[in-house]
Amino acid sequence: MTTKELINKNDKVKKARNHIVLFQPQIPQNTGNIARTCAATNAPLHIIKPMGFPIDDRKMKRAGLDYWDKLELHFYDHLEQFINQCHGQLHLISKFAVNNYSQATYADGDSHYFLFGREDTGLPEDFMREHAEKALRIPMNDEHVRSLNVSNTVCMVIYEALRQQGFQGLELKHTYEHDKLK
């Protein structure tokens, strides 16, 4: 690899990020909790409208606590508007997917956009069919449970990506003034 190629690769890695994308979220507490996870993992949050609640919903703000000012937040009027600005690998998270989310590769230097569907209906069926090769599944027992909570799913997926990336940009160890373990 030439020096120029190495510099370009390193620049790409520095610019690469994980992004969480919510398609028409319906439950304010889920969105607030996801916002908090995004703030904790340095992941921008993208929301595709319409939402099932107003953006200033008290329940959403409470679930996100006081982390809203630490969050990079983007809104889109429709799915196509988001797709047109998506400059990275798109992953559709769905119970209908064949590929396991933990077997995908996220440590490749690209930006990764993880798209999660509505809590009640998921992602649009035609969109899923058109992009089936990008769909990832979290294994679960489908006989007993219809789906996993979207907030929990976001957390599992983002931390798997971060694990593969060596938790880049996150504190692996922190010293607390009042450490409960000492």
From Swiss-Prot:
<dbReference type="InterPro" id="IPR029028">
    <property type="entry name" value="Alpha/beta_knot_MTases"/>
</dbReference>
<dbReference type="GO" id="GO:0141102">
    <property type="term" value="F:tRNA (5-carboxymethylaminomethyluridine(34)-2'-O)-methyltransferase activity"/>
</dbReference>
<keyword id="KW-0808">Transferase</keyword>
<dbReference type="GO" id="GO:0002130">
    <property type="term" value="P:wobble position ribose methylation"/>
</dbReference>
<dbReference type="GO" id="GO:0141098">
    <property type="term" value="F:tRNA (cytidine(34)-2'-O)-methyltransferase activity"/>
</dbReference>
<keyword id="KW-0489">Methyltransferase</keyword>
<dbReference type="Pfam" id="PF00588">
    <property type="entry name" value="SpoU_methylase"/>
</dbReference>
<comment type="similarity">
    <text>Belongs to the class IV-like SAM-binding methyltransferase superfamily. RNA methyltransferase TrmH family. TrmL subfamily.</text>
</comment>
<protein>
    <recommendedName>
        <fullName>Putative tRNA (cytidine(34)-2'-O)-methyltransferase</fullName>
        <ecNumber>2.1.1.207</ecNumber>
    </recommendedName>
</protein>
<keyword id="KW-0949">S-adenosyl-L-methionine</keyword>
<dbReference type="InterPro" id="IPR029026">
    <property type="entry name" value="tRNA_m1G_MTases_N"/>
</dbReference>
<keyword id="KW-0963">Cytoplasm</keyword>
<feature type="binding site">
    <location>
        <position position="117"/>
    </location>
    <ligand>
        <name>S-adenosyl-L-methionine</name>
    </ligand>
</feature>
<feature type="binding site">
    <location>
        <position position="147"/>
    </location>
    <ligand>
        <name>S-adenosyl-L-methionine</name>
    </ligand>
</feature>
<comment type="function">
    <text>Could methylate the ribose at the nucleotide 34 wobble position in tRNA.</text>
</comment>
<dbReference type="GO" id="GO:0003723">
    <property type="term" value="F:RNA binding"/>
</dbReference>
<dbReference type="GO" id="GO:0005737">
    <property type="term" value="C:cytoplasm"/>
</dbReference>
<feature type="binding site">
    <location>
        <position position="93"/>
    </location>
    <ligand>
        <name>S-adenosyl-L-methionine</name>
    </ligand>
</feature>
<keyword id="KW-0819">tRNA processing</keyword>
<dbReference type="InterPro" id="IPR001537">
    <property type="entry name" value="SpoU_MeTrfase"/>
</dbReference>
<feature type="binding site">
    <location>
        <position position="138"/>
    </location>
    <ligand>
        <name>S-adenosyl-L-methionine</name>
    </ligand>
</feature>
<dbReference type="InterPro" id="IPR016914">
    <property type="entry name" value="TrmL"/>
</dbReference>
